[in-house]
């Protein structure tokens, strides 16, 4: 088992990473009281819920529908109902067992129930293990934009059992690899090199390679969050491809494209725009496309009219004073958040996508 700490002073917490960590009793160390509510979905709960039993603790459960389209305030009411009907007080712990949708919603409910209770993330998808479970971003979607309603609320711990990824459907596994690639693109060129050299091992889910990829991704995420918890600066770099990607997800009603797939196409759009601006060498774009395609990911968005694409991007949370701000690349391993770019570079990128 590897342990990576997210250093936030008194609110620091560990990320436990490795095959079989669900069975190593780490959950019990982070329960404040002997009662917890397990929040999961209809896909994951039958597979892993029993492994989260804590000796001497009462763990109640609520099971939600699976899928991004259910990441809503209405779904959260099921969690609030379970907390209230179960008479949970502020000493309660919410345990999020599932992918990013479950983790985001359970974390948001924990942040808002009685003005805040503790929670533990137990991510069961690659995307959740390397990204959404770490950093305290919680929230739900709104019909007009992704993650528009939410709160920063750090977990007490993250338990990332890489063994559960062995049975993850290939499409979901590949979607998680998009977020892994992102860390290499924004700040870790050596990790990007390593990914290029270990495509085959990661595609076949070699346990050692997978544990390393998750650990390095979590290390990068933890370092960024420790330096900029509230996304005032560096943390916004973690959104490479997300402004384009969120527009894709919203346009397709959160039904057709997985989050990681949309991010993959969005990262390529950001790279193409960076080349147009003269910031990124064409070789950097070609390496990005080649690696994402090697991981079975889309590198072009669906056909979205330029005006509609712009409209969807205009509600992005990185924007300031009505100005669109994007994460762009200067090289592989070097990214920048900026609203200062030639407008035609964006126009040409959107038009090319259509």
From Swiss-Prot:
NCBIfam families: aroB. Coiled coil: none annotated. It is an enzyme of class 4 (lyase). Zn(2+) binds at residues 179, 242, 259. HAMAP family: DHQ_synthase (MF_00110). Pathway: Metabolic intermediate biosynthesis; chorismate biosynthesis; chorismate from D-erythrose 4-phosphate and phosphoenolpyruvate: step 2/7. Belongs to the sugar phosphate cyclases superfamily. Dehydroquinate synthase family. Its EC number is 4.2.3.4. This is 3-dehydroquinate synthase. GO terms for cellular component: cytoplasm. The gene is aroB. Its cofactor is Co(2+); Zn(2+); NAD(+).
